[in-house]
Structures are given as C-alpha cells and as structure tokens.
C-alpha cells in the first residue's frame, strides 16, 4: 500500500484484497471478550473532522482504540477553525503534537490530498470523506460486506468480486460514496450500474468505468447487490426532481421491487437512511438489508487500514485467537 489513503482509485487489486483479508483478521477481535490488540500502542491517531459525522468518526475512533493507539478527536466546531484558523496551521499544530496518522473529513474536495502532499505533517493521511469527491474507507467496507455475503467470510480470503453485478441508486451527483465504490468495485472485477434521475447524474459520467440506467426496474433482476443512496439536500441549491413522492415512486426501493431481485441479492445503504424516501421500512428492516453489518464491518476495515498504513506489529495480529465457538 501507499503511505496515504486518499482515493479508492489509488488502490490496485492486490492492495484492495490485502485490506479485505486483513479486515477478516481484525473481525476476529470483535468476537473476543476483550476487543483489543497492542499492535499500535504508543501511536497517535487524530480524527480531524470539519463536517458532522456519526458512523465514520465513531468507527475510526473505535478502530484506533482497538489497536491500542492514542486517539485525539478534533471537531471544527468549538476549535480555532471556527475563529478562522487555516488547514495549514491546524496541520502544523497536529504535527507538533506528534500525530502518526490524521483521519480527515472536510467539505472541500481535495483537502485530504492537500494535507498529504503539502509537507505540513509527516504522518499518514486517511480520507474520511472530502466534499463530493471520495470516501475510500466506505467503499472498502461496502466491498468487504459484499464479499462476505456473496462469496463467504471463510471462502472469500484472497478473492475479489469478479463477475458480480452491483447497482448503485440515488443521488450520484453529490455522492462521494458512489465515486469511491465505482473505482474500487471495478478494480475488484465487479460490473457497476448507476441508476438515478438525469438531473442527479454527474457531467462526464460516460467516462466512468460503469453503466448508467434511468430505470431501477430494468436492472433489479440482474443485480447481486443494490446500494441505495440518500438524496443530499444539504448540497443542493435547486430542485433536482419534482417532489419527494415522485422520486420515491421511481427510484425508491420497496418490498415489491425487492421481490424482483435474485434470492441471493442484498440491499445496502451507507447511511444515514431516509426511510420512506429512497428505502421503505420493510426493506430496511429485512434480512436482506446489510446496513447494521456495514457499520460493524466499518470498524474492521478501518482497523485494517490503520494497521497497514502505520506498520502495526505482525506478532500482535497473529496472536489474535481464531474464531471458535468458545470465543464467539
């Protein structure tokens, strides 16, 4: 792997499979009474969040703590950033404090890249979401969830998603999750189809390594996984569709539409969900929906990323006991 994780497009197939396989090892820790490894003891991980977050911030914090790293949580609200401090000065402050890794979420696309290439800090930089650009660890946990469900947790080691057909539905225009997933899933051999109203499809999407459809019903029967995306109204300054009811009628996933999917197919959502709009309660609460699994898998994936970027102790990892009936 490279020194930083800025974009899913930076990952080769071997990089991605290594992260997924390492995450399987990390998942064993979650089955233990004491969910902790000493592998990053003495290292400092800073969660630098300029945007609100629940799942991602808590997930990174849990991941770092399970690896025994010291964690500093930084929120732009209530900090000197709210007084006008620049990203550079914030980064220099973190460097002075000895940060070994900085996990950054920022509203500006490209902020993590700037932090990683500026020379302001020496530590590893992990992109936890930048504007509408990318969210690579979300794509990794999505791929991890797909591999576990569609290939198998035990039989999936070393394998990718070759031949799997993944459909991503919703606000593609504003979705950093969609962009990262398109890059990563195609790298892993999957075939990706984007489904959205024409107004929520980005300009230049024809250059992306995926297909585009404007009809959800046309693609459900041949999908191994359907990922629903929230409409990001906070990034909109105009009307992109007539009404929420009309959007839900054409692009929402309900029980009737879910029944058109193959029996093995799964329903995914990166969260937060808006029940009744892009997904109904019936679908969200069904056994085919992996939302809760994705949250749990996110901790394992982020443990793997931090472990690999910071050169954790292989001895500590190999000391984690295998999953057995006794320690489940």
Swiss-Prot record:
L-aspartate binds at residues 83, 176, 230. InterPro entries: Asp/Orn_carbamoyltranf_P-bd, Asp/Orn_carbamoylTrfase, Asp/Orn_carbamoylTrfase_sf, Asp_carbamoyltransf, Asp_carbamoyltransf_Asp/Orn-bd. It comes from the Bacteria. Its EC number is 2.1.3.2. Carbamoyl phosphate binds at residues 55-56, 105, 135, 138, 271-272. Pfam families: OTCace (PF00185), OTCace_N (PF02729). Keywords: Pyrimidine biosynthesis, Transferase. Pathway: Pyrimidine metabolism; UMP biosynthesis via de novo pathway; (S)-dihydroorotate from bicarbonate: step 2/3. GO terms for molecular function: amino acid binding; aspartate carbamoyltransferase activity. It catalyses: carbamoyl phosphate + L-aspartate = N-carbamoyl-L-aspartate + phosphate + H(+). One of its GO terms (cellular component) is cytosol. One of its GO terms (biological process) is 'de novo' pyrimidine nucleobase biosynthetic process. It is an enzyme of class 2 (transferase). PANTHER family: ASPARTATE CARBAMOYLTRANSFERASE, ORNITHINE CARBAMOYLTRANSFERASE, MITOCHONDRIAL. Heterododecamer (2C3:3R2) of six catalytic PyrB chains organized as two trimers (C3), and six regulatory PyrI chains organized as three dimers (R2). Belongs to the aspartate/ornithine carbamoyltransferase superfamily. ATCase family. Catalyzes the condensation of carbamoyl phosphate and aspartate to form carbamoyl aspartate and inorganic phosphate, the committed step in the de novo pyrimidine nucleotide biosynthesis pathway. This is Aspartate carbamoyltransferase catalytic subunit. It comes from Streptomyces griseus subsp. griseus (strain JCM 4626 / CBS 651.72 / NBRC 13350 / KCC S-0626 / ISP 5235). The gene is pyrB.
């Amino acid at each position: 792997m490279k020194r930083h994780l800025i974009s899913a497009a930076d990952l080769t197939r071997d990089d991605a499979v290594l992260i997924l396989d390492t995450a399987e090892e990390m998942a064993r820790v979650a089955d233990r009474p004491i969910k902790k490894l000493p592998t990053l003891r003495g290292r400092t991980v800073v969660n630098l969040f300029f945007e609100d977050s629940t799942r991602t911030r808590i997930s990174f914090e849990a991941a770092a703590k399970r690896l025994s790293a010291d964690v500093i949580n930084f929120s732009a609200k209530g900090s000197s950033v709210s007084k006008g401090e620049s990203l550079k000065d914030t980064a220099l402050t973190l460097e002075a404090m000895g940060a070994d890794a900085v996990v950054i979420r920022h509203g500006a696309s490209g902020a993590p890249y700037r932090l990683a290439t500026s020379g302001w800090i020496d530590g590893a930089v992990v992109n936890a979401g930048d504007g509408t650009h990318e969210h690579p660890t979300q794509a990794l946990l999505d791929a991890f969830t797909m591999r576990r469900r569609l290939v198998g947790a035990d039989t999936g080691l070393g394998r990718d998603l070759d031949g799997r057909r993944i459909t991503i539905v919703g606000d593609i225009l504003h979705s950093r999750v969609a962009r990262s997933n398109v890059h990563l899933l195609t790298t892993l051999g999957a075939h990706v189809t984007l489904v959205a109203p024409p107004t929520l499809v980005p300009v230049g999407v024809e250059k992306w390594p995926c297909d585009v459809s404007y009809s959800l019903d046309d693609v459900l029967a041949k999908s191994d996984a359907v990922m629903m995306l929230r409409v990001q109204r906070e990034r909109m300054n105009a009307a992109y569709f007539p009404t929420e009811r009309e959007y839900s009628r054409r692009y929402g996933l309900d029980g009737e539409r879910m029944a058109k999917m193959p029996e093995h197919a799964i329903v995914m959502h990166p969260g937060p969900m808006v029940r009744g709009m892009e997904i109904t309660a019936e679908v969200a609460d069904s056994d085919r929906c992996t939302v809760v699994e994705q949250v749990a898998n996110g901790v394992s994936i982020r443990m793997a990323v931090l472990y690999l970027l910071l050169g954790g102790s292989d001895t500590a990892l190999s000391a984690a006991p295998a999953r057995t009936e006794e320690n489940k």
